[in-house]
């Protein structure tokens, strides 16, 4: 019988290994093309801005977001697993290549996070 302590240690080690592999795969091998993504991002600019900074209160900022996260969210909108009125119109027309390119472009945008005074 494996002790609870040993099981916990195995869980922590496997989690850390998985996270490090995910981080390495996301930062080393980008599947998308940043330049192609910028051209495709023209369709995103009304809500998210060409710079990935939201132009409306209902659209999130996506500049500098982690690439695998953007890919996963666009795929979820495309499949219908995630719902949003605007994205439900746009996402179904995106190819896998479009999704990879858009994610590469928006994740490559450098942002500066500034702490608000008094917070």
Predicted stretch roles:
Residues 18, 24-26:
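N-terminal signal peptide c-region/cleavage motif recognized by signal peptidases
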Residues 28-30:
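Signal peptide processing junction and immediate N-terminal pro/mature segment
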Residues 32-41, 50-53, 82-119:
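Flexible coil segments in periplasmic/lumen-exposed cytochrome c-class electron-transfer proteins
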Residues 58-61, 71-78, 88-92:
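A structural feature that tracks compact, well-ordered secondary-structure segments
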């Amino acid at each position: 019988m494996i002790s609870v302590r040993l099981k916990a240690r195995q869980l922590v080690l496997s989690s850390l290994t998985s996270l490090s592999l995910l981080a390495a795969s996301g930062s080393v091998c980008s599947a998308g093309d940043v330049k192609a993504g910028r051209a495709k991002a023209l369709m995103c600019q009304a809500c998210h801005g060409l710079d990935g900074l939201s132009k409306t209160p209902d659209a999130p900022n996506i500049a500098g977001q982690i690439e695998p996260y953007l890919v996963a969210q666009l795929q979820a909108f495309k499949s219908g697993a995630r719902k949003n009125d605007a994205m439900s119109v746009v996402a179904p027309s995106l190819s896998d290549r479009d999704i990879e390119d858009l994610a590469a472009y928006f994740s490559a945008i450098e942002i500066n996070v500034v702490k608000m005074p008094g917070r």
